[in-house]
Amino acid sequence: MNLFCISLEGSMDSLYEPIPEQQANQENMSSRTDSPIPPFGESEQTPNNLFVGVSNLENAKPKKRKLFRRFMSENKIFEGKTVNDKIWQEHSKHKNDSHIRRPCQLKDLNENDFLSNNIHTYQGKTLQGTSYQVTSECWSPFHYQRHVETTVDELVRHFFPDVTI
């Protein structure tokens, strides 16, 4: 059921009354006249009228959309150049990537190796006339701490110092 609200002056109360059927039908008909396709199921519609409605849709001008084109690849580096009225900062290039390392890349180091030299260099064989060198820097707490499981007796002594075993 369609309802509309009438507010009374000087009152916070509102009255709700049903919209008269004749007024509701007129509003529906007026809103349908703007539509290029006639409503479904009305008896006065013929196939020719439906065809005209569909052709009106096809002839309607599409909305213009602004397209944002990417003129250059996202991966391209702009070095102080002005592109589309924007000044791009120079990208920092890392010539030495030795700061990128995984911990303990090549082998487990024993405590003596680690204490004698923190940087371990391994010289590899020559591959097609080019020699390669791998540098590994790592620190592992397990080299210095021996993990020993606590016994039940030690736990009892720790948590219950008054108890004798």
UniProtKB/Swiss-Prot annotation:
Top-rank lineage group of the source organism: Eukaryota
Compositional bias ranges of the Polar residues kind: 22-34
Region (Disordered): 22-45
Name of protein: Putative uncharacterized protein ENSP00000383407
Protein species of origin: Homo sapiens
